[in-house]
Regions:
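A short, N-terminal "cap"/entry segment at the start of jelly-roll beta-barrel domains
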Residues: 1-41, 121
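Conserved short histidine dyad/triad with adjacent acidic residue
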Residues: 30-33, 43-60, 94
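Short, conserved beta-strand element in jelly-roll/cupin
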Residues: 46-50, 60-75
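A short hydrophobic beta-strand segment most commonly corresponding to one strand
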Residues: 47, 91, 106-121
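Short beta-strand His + acidic residue motifs that chelate non-heme Fe in jelly-roll/DSBH
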Residues: 55-57, 75-76, 92, 98-105
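Residue-level recognition of conserved beta-strand positions in structured domain cores
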Residues: 59, 70, 77-79, 102, ...
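Short acidic-glycine-tyrosine-enriched beta hairpin
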Residues: 79-94
Length: 121
């Protein structure tokens, strides 16, 4: 098997926007993976949450990592609630239900790293 190693750069100004299902008052950009780069294991998005912006309670078959870059984001699961400040991070297991909300009056930005769904999901 041959692997071709090639760096892939996505410039912020050229990152495509995408609609994240179940999100309101959230603008999302795809930075890596999916249609942007050949990443085989995960994709990376950047989500800008306006005040009271939210991702409704949902789960998926892929694990997720959230890293807050600016502002504050509250992540709620069935077993815990945590408010994340800049450079705080959070792991959400595959199948774990979560709600994400910006409860502040200032915008918040979060990096989203998500594994691809297992084949057949």
């Amino acid at each position: 098997m041959h692997y071709f190693y090639r760096m892939h750069v996505t410039r912020y100004q050229q990152a495509p926007s995408y609609e994240a299902p179940g999100h309101s008052k959230v603008a999302s950009l795809r930075l890596q993976g999916q249609e942007v780069s050949p990443s085989r294991n995960c994709w990376v998005g950047l989500s800008h949450y306006l005040p009271q912006g939210a991702a409704e309670s949902a789960s998926s078959n892929a694990e997720k990592i959230y890293v807050v870059l600016s502002g504050e984001i509250t992540v709620i699961t069935d077993s815990a609630e945590a408010t994340l400040a800049p450079l705080d991070s959070c792991y959400i297991a595959a199948g774990e239900r979560r709600t994400v909300i910006n409860r502040t009056n200032a915008p918040a930005t979060m990096l989203v790293i998500m594994g691809y769904l297992p084949t057949g999901s």
